[in-house]
């Protein structure tokens, strides 16, 4: 099985017009004397070789996922296009993602980071650069801005508005502060305008991703909490009244409703004072159009790269017209194309003034279950539904040869997946460890191949043997199965939310309509806008109305499913969107979390154990992972998205100019700045 998957991966990356270079396959096409030359990086080209345009330059980007308007933080959800907007608007994270396994301090932001153990807790002391400002060029960014960011995001006031602050639960003092039992966040200290510290709970150490512990983006207190300031006390940091003579702190839920969620001025939809490479100049919630212009005061990303394209526009793109719209000039760039029909049309434009880029996906497509309620709360029902899906046929119909079925919580671009396939190993590995690596495969994962008889057996064993009258279910007579749950009968009814105009969701529904009713399921399908689906998925209106839906996600910088599954699955918000509460799964995720940094073998072993438990429980129904394609005009040069960073990171290195006859080949950015930190479920995508 492992060899077959690896072979298919190779076909995807070599034979399907993906254009893998000699460098990326490990082969060399240069004489030995030239092989030692340092490769030209995207940063080299961006800083040295980009031409300066005499006229303003503009790029219009099309993405199949329309923005939802969450431009402040991912604490209320992670629509992929919202995440792209945030990456453009919010910068100066303390840490940058230098590879798929490591964060480093961003040298443009941080002078030094030192660590020491205090009372068993690892304490990180951060000294900042002194020339950071927001996009107005007048408001300085100091240690207070980072401390305010932590106080704000971990606050009970934000939680009352539905924010998921689980990212911050590793900070000492979080529990008391978040619960409203303490006004201070004891694990954070403010030394001066340039220096502050963050203490991490001992029971969260070690942490495989190490410096991800200090992930933090600055936010302006003058905008989000006017009248407030940050002070340090002997017990930690806290918010205080800007007027020292006034004891009442003007930081309330009602105040945040105004500063965050006001539809015309709120920081969620219209963040004006920001720190990233671009500034927001316009947002139309109806059309989904978002406009940006350069932030002239931006210092650069972790490699010192600043963007040169003057303005950007992000628009929703529709699968049936997007390639023609690219050819007609409506778009300059199409991002994250998945549908095989779109990809094949896009590939036809190559050599006609357009270029194709591709990269393996870190995430996967899946059917989401609301595991906190209804028939789908039972593992046997989820497994039965899995046996009613012909995943291989679905993947072939939807992706053709541009994707693969998956059977767990993983994507084909993750190093852990590649290692389990046998196609990736650490650079130096002993013979003994090599044998251990060879034993780590995905072969134990159940594929849940189409088998309606097995599905029926699972239902019967789980007690779905009654009819509406509480008597024995008789096939051919009764249509819907029931189960006695407590004193009541539960109907085997699934309400599926199908995103309007979504080809993948249509294929899934068609399959389920052909299998589920014959087994005694009732399947109700609601065709809804993507924004409505997301509102329900994130429980923004309380209890979820839908039992299933089709979605896709990309795992972001930190693959840490502990935070994704450790929260109470019945609570509203972004935490544990599967709704499943399983102690064993959480403990397996925690073992991954607490793997020592750079201990790849142990992490892989823990990762595989987690995947096997996930595959058994099916918090979601995994379907596929795939190769992404971006298509763009060849006027957009030095643009090279990759598995680890999307178009907002790649656009910093790009420029817009008439292509020369001997254009400099694009080189991939080596990483992203980690503006959005994924901790399990990442960005949510419409495909």
Kindly give the residue locations of the regions a language model identified.
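Append "and occasionally in soluble cytosolic enzymes with long acidic Gly/Pro-rich linkers
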Residues: 293, 377-514
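Detector for C-terminal structural segments
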Residues: 388-433, 504-513, 539-687
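Surface-exposed binding/hinge segments that line
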Residues: 162-254, 423-427
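Ligand-site clamp/hinge motif
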Residues: 264-269, 297-345, 522
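Gly/Pro-rich hinge or "lid" segments in bacterial periplasmic/extracellular proteins
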Residues: 212-306, 311, 452, 457-461
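N-terminal lobe/hinge region of extracytoplasmic solute-binding protein
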Residues: 41, 60-117
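Aromatic- and charge-enriched surface segment that lines or borders ligand/interaction sites
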Residues: 111-167, 191, 197, 325, ...
């Amino acid at each position: 099985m492992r060899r077959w998957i690896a072979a298919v991966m190779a076909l995807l990356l070599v034979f399907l017009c993906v254009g893998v270079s000699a460098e990326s396959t490990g082969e060399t096409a240069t004489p030995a004397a030239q092989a030692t030359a340092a490769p030209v990086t995207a940063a080299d080209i961006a800083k040295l070789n980009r031409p300066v345009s005499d006229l303003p330059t503009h790029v219009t980007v099309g993405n199949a996922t329309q923005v939802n308007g969450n431009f402040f933080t991912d604490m209320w959800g992670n629509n992929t296009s919202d995440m792209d907007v945030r990456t453009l608007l919010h910068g100066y994270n303390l840490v940058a993602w230098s590879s798929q396994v490591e964060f480093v301090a961003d040298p443009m932001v941080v002078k030094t980071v030192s660590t020491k153990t205090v009372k068993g807790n690892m304490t990180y002391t951060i000294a900042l650069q002194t020339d950071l400002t927001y996009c107005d060029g007048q408001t300085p960014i100091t240690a207070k801005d980072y401390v305010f960011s932590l106080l704000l995001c971990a606050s009970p006031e934000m939680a009352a508005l539905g924010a998921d602050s689980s990212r911050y639960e590793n900070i000492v003092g979080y529990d008391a502060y978040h619960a409203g039992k303490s006004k201070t966040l004891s694990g954070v200290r403010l030394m001066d305008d340039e220096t502050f510290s963050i203490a991490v709970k001992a029971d969260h150490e070690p942490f495989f991703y190490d410096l991800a512990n200090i992930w933090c983006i600055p936010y302006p207190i003058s905008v989000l909490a006017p009248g407030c300031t940050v002070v340090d006390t002997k017990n930690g940091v806290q918010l205080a009244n800007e007027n020292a003579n006034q004891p009442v702190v003007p930081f309330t839920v009602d105040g945040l409703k105004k500063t965050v969620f006001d539809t015309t001025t709120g920081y969620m939809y219209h963040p004006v004072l920001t720190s990233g490479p671009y500034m927001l100049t316009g947002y139309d919630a109806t059309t989904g159009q978002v406009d940006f212009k350069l932030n002239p005061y931006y210092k650069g990303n972790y490699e010192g790269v600043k963007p040169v394209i003057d303005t950007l526009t992000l628009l929703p793109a529709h699968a049936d017209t997007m390639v023609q719209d690219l050819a007609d000039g409506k778009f300059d760039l199409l991002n994250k194309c998945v549908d095989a029909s779109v990809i094949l049309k896009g590939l036809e434009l190559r050599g006609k003034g357009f270029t194709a880029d591709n990269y393996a996906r870190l995430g996967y497509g899946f059917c989401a279950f609301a595991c906190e309620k209804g028939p789908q709360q039972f593992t046997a029902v989820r497994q039965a539904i899995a046996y009613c899906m012909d995943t291989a046929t679905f993947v072939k119909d939807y992706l053709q040869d541009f994707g693969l079925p998956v059977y767990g919580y993983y994507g084909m671009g993750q190093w852990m997946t590649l290692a389990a396939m046998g196609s990736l190993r650490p650079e130096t590995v002993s013979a003994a460890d090599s044998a251990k690596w060879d034993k780590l495969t995905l072969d134990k994962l159940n594929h849940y191949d189409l088998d309606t008889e097995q599905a029926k057996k699972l239902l019967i064993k789980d007690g779905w043997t009654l009819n509406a009258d509480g008597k024995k279910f008789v096939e051919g007579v009764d249509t819907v199965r029931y189960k006695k749950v407590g004193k009541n009968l539960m109907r085997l009814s699934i309400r599926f939310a199908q995103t309007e105009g979504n080809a993948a969701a249509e294929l899934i529904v068609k399959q389920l309509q052909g299998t589920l009713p014959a087994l005694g399921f009732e399947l109700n399908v609601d065709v809804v806008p993507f924004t409505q689906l997301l509102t329900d998925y994130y429980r923004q209106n309380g209890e979820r109305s839908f039992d299933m839906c089709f979605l896709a996600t990309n795992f972001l910088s930190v693959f840490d499913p502990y935070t994704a599954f450790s929260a109470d699955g019945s609570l509203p918000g972004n935490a544990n969107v599967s709704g499943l509460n399983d102690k064993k799964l959480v403990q397996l995720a925690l073992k991954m979390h607490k793997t020592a940094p750079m201990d790849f073998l142990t992490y892989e072993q823990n990762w595989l154990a987690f995947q096997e438990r996930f595959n058994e429980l099916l918090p979601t129904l995994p379907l596929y992972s795939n190769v992404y394609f971006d298509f763009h005009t060849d006027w957009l040069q030095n643009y090279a998205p990759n598995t680890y960073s999307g178009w907002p990171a790649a656009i910093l290195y790009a420029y817009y100019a008439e292509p020369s006859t001997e254009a400099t080949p694009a080189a991939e950015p080596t990483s992203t700045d980690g503006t959005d930190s994924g901790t399990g479920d990442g960005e949510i995508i419409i495909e």
